Amino acid sequence: RNRRAGALSGGMKQKLALSCALIHKPDVLFLDEPTTGVDPVSRKEFWEMLRRLREQGITIIASTPIIDEACQCDRIAFINEGRIRGIDTPDRILKQFADILCPAGLMHEKADNCESYVIEVDGLTKRFGSFTAVDHISFKVRQGEIFGFLGANGAGKTTAMRMLTGLSHPTEGKARVAGFNVATRSEDVKRNIGYMSQKFSLYEDLKVWENIRLFAGIYGIPEPEIAPRTDELLLRL
C-alpha cells in the first residue's frame, strides 16, 4: 500500500495498473499488450484475474503477440499487416493459420452465447499519409467476453486499440463501444472504459494507494467513494 510504484516488481506494477484501470468500474476493459516484460508466473496470475473479471460481466479486449496468451481468450482476431485475417476460437485460428503461427498449449473457455454486443466495428481504418496501419477491420464483441488481438509487433493492434478507446480518430469506418460512437462520442467512450497501455501508465514516484486515488480523480469518481474503492482494490492486490 505505502510502497512507491517504482519499487514494485514487474508483476505487481502490472496488477496495480489493472487496479487503476478498474477504479471507476468500467463496462469494457482495453489491455494493450499488458504482460510485456513480465515473468511467466505473474503473467499466469494476471490472466486468472482477467477470468474473474469476466465472471463479473466485464468485457475485455486484449492485444498480444504471445500465442499462449491469445489461447486464453474466448475468441481472437488474427491481425497481419493492418488487416484481420480471421476471427474464431483460438484453436481454430491456430489450425487455420498453422503455416504462420506456431501452435502452443491451448487453454480455451467459451463465453456464454449472449447476443448483447458491447463493441461493434465496421470497416474501421486508420491511415498515416500513404501508410495504412489498420485496414477495414470489422468484428463484434459480446458482453462478458474476452476477445484478443493476436499479431506481431507492427501488425496494427495498438492503432486499433487507440481508435476503439477514443484516443485516435478513424480515417474511415465506424465503431461503437459501450453504446457510443468512437468518432463522435469519444469522451463518453473514455468515461465507460478502462484502458491499460503497454507502459502500464503508472506514476512511479507515487505510492501504490496514491496511484489508485489519482486515477479515481481522473475518472471523476465522487470524493466520498474514492477511499472505499481504493481499499477494495488494494485488497485484490
Where are the regions a protein language model picked out?
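ABC ATPase "signature
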Residues: 87-88
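Conserved catalytic motifs of ABC-family nucleotide-binding domains
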Residues: 25
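Conserved ABC ATPase "signature" region
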Residues: 1, 213, 217, 222-237
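Catalytic Walker B motif of ABC-type/P-loop ATPase nucleotide-binding domains
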Residues: 29-32
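Conserved ABC ATPase signature
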Residues: 4-8
